[in-house]
Amino acid sequence: PRTLKMAGAVADGVFIRVGTHSSNILSSIKVIWEGAEEAGRDKKDVKLGIIFHTVLHDHIEQATLMAKSMAAGYFEYSPVLFENLGYEWNGPDPEELKANEDVWPDFHHSSDLVASGSIVNFISTEQARSFALVGGNDDISTQLLNVLYTAAENGIEFEHVVLHPIPNPPTPDEGPGSYLERVPREILPAVRNALSTSLG
């Protein structure tokens, strides 16, 4: 929170990455705006961006396991994001799990996110979906729209929305099944159309 408040006080723009749950998103923006106002700035002068871990995968069980690994990574580095939502960590300490199960370097960057997600399968699907967009193109479009609608209802407009691919795509990422082609073809048009219709 102190870093967010400081950013609100001095930055032209702030990117946040706090998962997909609106409570964590709204509380983070509130702190940024408080920092701006305490510094005598108009909060609207602070441009906002948001990053979502995005598991675009049509095999929902594997996608959910990868999302559980993402949730574990958030708990590992920012446990307050779990606490804010009333979530409990019902497993061993993340450092113990990483050491015993050979997760390297962490739950966000494991080379096998399905395997690392299986290690933290005590994380519920609800919890996993609070920290990542998960599923096929329709699932992700719906989840993203719900977040953006809630933000708009609270006076929040994001200048930039980044869908960070999970896992990292190969290089080069080419072809009709690639993340780089699927997102602009299957997700972004539907989201833009829905927003233009509902928000004018």
Tell where the protein language model's regions lie, with residue ranges.
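Alpha-helical segments flanking ligand/cofactor-binding loops in enzyme cores
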Residues: L4-G8, L145
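Receiver (REC) domain switch/active-site residues of two-component response regulators
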Residues: D12-F15, E159
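An alpha-helical appendage that flanks or caps ligand/catalytic pockets
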Residues: I25-I156, L195-L199
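Glycine-rich, proline-tolerant flexible connector loops at the mouths of alpha/beta enzymes
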Residues: V18-S22, V161-L180
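Alpha-helix-loop-beta-strand connector modules within alpha/beta enzyme cores
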Residues: E181-L199
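Short acidic active-site motifs
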Residues: R2-T3, H59
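Active-site beta-loop-alpha junctions enriched in small/polar residues
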Residues: P1, G19, I51-V55, I166-N168
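Residues at alpha-helix caps and immediate loop-helix transition turns in enzyme cores, especially N-
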Residues: V10, N24-S28, H59, G175-L180
